[in-house]
């Protein structure tokens, strides 16, 4: 057995070219689709971060009896069962909720794991003193603002680092058998923070304050802001 599980957080199939989207540029997803079986009637049970992961590990619906949380001591975890059966399991992710209180105990089910830092409000880089947030619509986070200074530009994004580590794993273990590689980038989860080179592929008429982190609420922002925020999401997909 040699298997790769590729999981993107907050990925909407309606925004992918293989599923008929006309406003995004997703060439890598198109290449993947050419070598894949595409499902058009496959539905998730739980959609939030950790409930969805618990369903993935256990094969049971999470939303019926609990909310956002860790793997429970009584849960049977798929990667752990594989590990006990002699299949080497490895997780590569920048999904920072894996290593925070309340969301932990998933990554420890694998033989080994690599955590890429810097996404969302990950308490990664230290900054002693006040952090000034720029004018913005929607949400903003001071720790995220600190982190952004270290992940700007090509080659520095956590998403790129995750796939770099995946290539490293495959190169190191290309001749091995009996392994599961779980690759899980947090993108395109908000905030929609992509390099300028990709943002520039999506032009709009928005000239307001920063808007790349929409609130979990009814949409009340001006149409131009909505289009701009959607374009930031598209830049991450590209």
Give residue ranges: language-model regions.
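Catalytic domains that recognize anionic headgroups
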Residues: 1-238
